[in-house]
From Swiss-Prot:
Homodimer. Its EC number is 2.1.1.177. SUPFAM superfamilies: alpha/beta knot. It is an enzyme of class 2 (transferase). Specifically methylates the pseudouridine at position 1915 (m3Psi1915) in 23S rRNA. Belongs to the RNA methyltransferase RlmH family. S-adenosyl-L-methionine binds at L64, G96, F115, S116, K117, M118, T119, F120. Coiled coil: none annotated. It holds the Pfam family SPOUT_MTase. This is Ribosomal RNA large subunit methyltransferase H.
Length: 147
């Protein structure tokens, strides 16, 4: 599985960056791309165009959105397994900025995924996502990390 995470904004907290990097190193085949946060509702469209330009044509796109489908960790692992088996090894995850994702990005997405009905800062979502990708790999490989 080849993973790309496109996120709006930078993770400024050193501790969060260390945790994100810890899990990213465990995943190995991961690329993280940061898009400049435009910090306005009108800037969301500009962010969307930048995001779309970073998505590989053969990639399965999963965007994090509050209205998306909620999965538990095992269902998430099964989804990633299904995607890589049926659509190829390339998966792109997208984390929007404070105003969310543009309509164009949501339309390009193969799956809208929600971690909760609550709203979280994009910095925390990046950590949650990287950890869940690592956990999914552990589940699929019968590794004891997932209890």
């Amino acid at each position: 599985m080849k993973v790309k995470i496109i996120s709006v904004g930078k993770v400024k907290d050193k501790g969060l960056n260390e945790l994100i990097n810890y899990y990213a190193k465990q995943i190995k085949t991961i690329e993280m791309v940061e898009i400049t946060d435009e910090a306005s509702i009108t800037g969301m469209e500009k962010e969307g165009q930048k995001i779309l330009s970073k998505i590989a044509k053969d990639s399965y796109v999963i965007s994090l959105a509050i209205e998306g489908k909620m999965l538990d960790s095992v269902e998430f692992a099964d989804t990633l397994d299904h995607v890589t088996t049926n659509f190829g090894p390339s998966i792109t995850f997208i984390i929007g900025g404070s105003f969310g994702l543009s309509h164009a990005v949501k339309e390009k997405s193969n799956l809208l995924l929600s971690f909760s009905k609550m709203t979280f800062p994009h910095q925390l979502m990046k950590l949650f996502l990287v950890e869940q990708i690592f956990r999914a790999q552990a589940i699929l490989n019968n590794h004891p990390y997932h209890k």
